[in-house]
Amino acid sequence: MCGIFGYANFSKERSKDEIANIMINGLKRIEYRGYDSAGFCITDNTDRNFARIRAVGKVNSLYEIKNSQTSVDLTRKVLNHVSIAHTRWATHGQPSIENSHPLSSDENNSFLVVHNGIITNYKDLKVYLKKKGFTFESDTDTECAAKLALYFYREMERKKEETDFVAIVKNVVKHCEGAFAFVFASSLFPNELVTVRKSSPVLIGLKPSGKMSFDFFGVNYGDPADDTPTSLLDSPLAFSKSDRHGFDQNIDMMTRDVQDCTLHAHNKEPLEVFVASDASALIEHTRKVIFLEDNDIVHISNGNISIHRMHSKAKESGPEIREVKTIETELAAIMKGNYDHYMIKEINEQEESVVNTMRGRINFESLTVSLGGLKDHVSGIRKSQRIIFVACGTSYHASLANRALLEELLEIPVSVEIASDFLDRAPPIMRSDCVFFVSQSGETADSVMALRYCMSMGALCVGITNTVGSTISRETACGVHINAGPEIGVASTKAYTSQYIALVLVALQLSDQNLVKQARRREIMEGLKNISSQINRVLELSTSVKSLANGPMKDDASLLLIGRGYQYPTCMEGALKIKEITYIHAEGLAAGELKHGPIALVDDKLRIIFIATKDLLYDKTRNAMEQIFARGGRPIVICTEDISGDYAEYDTFVVPKTVDCLQGILTVIPLQLLSYHLAVAKGYNADFPRNLAKSVTVE
């Protein structure tokens, strides 16, 4: 939800047109997060103020606006410059130019801000600021942050105190409640950016002209005075001495000074710094990144970078350094290549992505599984009294799909929770519980909040994510990276099958000492050995699925998807895909529940997708299907090849047979293909479904 991008060049000559194109391209890389408007700022012809270039609609429209404006000479070259940009997903205020970021404090752009997240107390702040004479141009919560910054700046001047950008932003953050990330720029502080992370992801990219000679930054903790709560509404303002930082403005050779927590660029060596909410916006520029922690404040100033904390070390313990890490993602992985959409590209990548999930973790010769991320905690997980999965959306379905297998192999009670409902109930969590948090991004707000709740209860917390450096991957005790590669399409496809595989591997490793289960484990591992080639065979169904989607089905108003056992979660996931990108109402039902109400919907107009696989529950599944046939239902059948002859008279998609607990990996792919081809047939953009965001980072 929303995307942030920032760029600063120091002693690196760039034309303003180059800078503008870097900003727009950065936004294009994070389009998939979901948005309805976009914008960026760049210094105007005075080089002392900013021009804001904003648009409702697609990021590409910024190119035309940029080229038609007159306040910025795009041919002008600058040696030092900062700029911030944003894609907005409306939460407060409708999509409009006025509500698009960057948002400003005043007509002089004394402070500009881009923001991801929600300021929950913005109404109270707005009332206070209006009483102080501020007027608002937007309906957003974000504008309060910009005007608060100007308010604190004026307070410092009124008190004849030294004004300092970091001190100002610290006080803004102290008075804003909620989960958010900010990046501030200011006409009062040229060539400076201040970035804040508070429960919303931000990372910093570093691109020096030469090789980096260090691999971490020191962290400057605040003064004890920073720990005292302050409120504009009921107490005087307090500025601690620790909020004043004197930064070396000389640009010298690159060194690391842990005491000052500052990166110095000496001898006018060029340095480019990037700020982003997602690594996808950085990889074409640099592989060197810093993942920020909650309550980190980063000051980028004239070639210097320093990291500060909101509070003193007495109040919050934590690492005293931030490592510079290398991201391994290739640029080609986030490009569409020859495909029309990312979604169909990612569906077709599943043959390879499931192999990447298993690579180095399963030995098919010795039939052993080893998950390095769990090895130090395997014993603790095995000793758990119960296992709980907490997830949202597709990740919830992947967890549900593996519940029966985990119960079978581990002989431990397993429950699967929707993260938001879990938070609403705040159920009792014991120290003897093991809780898995499954999230493609590792930043899903409800899952992160649930993680912190479970940590506070003393449970052993495990992360299953697709994003290195994400909040869940950092804050859990251990975990598994699914290695699916970047997933750009909003509707998750390859992440689902990789999560599915990863959870199967978890079940296999945790049960490796159970002698009674060894035959079953071998059967599953033999199935995993062939799963990639079987996926390839299923992908060959794309043409026949497309033919069905291009027919009358695209005009259907509603669909039911029915399955039993391992196929029930598959139906739920397929229904979600159809809802997400075709806007057709779809519902996944358990076949055993059909006669308890849903059968009342069946008539000769309702299209029903049945998943039938030759497993222990097939006879019961077949009985449910007969009830549908008897009432004139119009079935589409996804079945395994050994029973395909039973459904020759219906529209049928035949998939290879595998072990029952893996069958859902193969039966979900026709549903992914169907949702994609239906969306295209209806004229919708499968990559950017309306009202949806890829990474839901607000509650």
UniProtKB/Swiss-Prot annotation:
GO molecular function: carbohydrate derivative binding; glutamine-fructose-6-phosphate transaminase (isomerizing) activity
Keyword Lipid metabolism annotated: no
Catalysed reactions listed for this entry: D-fructose 6-phosphate + L-glutamine = D-glucosamine 6-phosphate + L-glutamate
Residues of the Glutamine amidotransferase type-2 domain: 2-303
UniProt-listed Enzyme Commission number(s): 2.6.1.16
Function: Involved in amino sugar synthesis (formation of chitin, supplies the amino sugars of asparagine-linked oligosaccharides of glycoproteins).
Record NCBIfam families: glmS (TIGR01135), PRK00331.1 (NF001484)
UniProt protein name: Glutamine--fructose-6-phosphate aminotransferase [isomerizing]
Gene that specifies this protein: GFA1
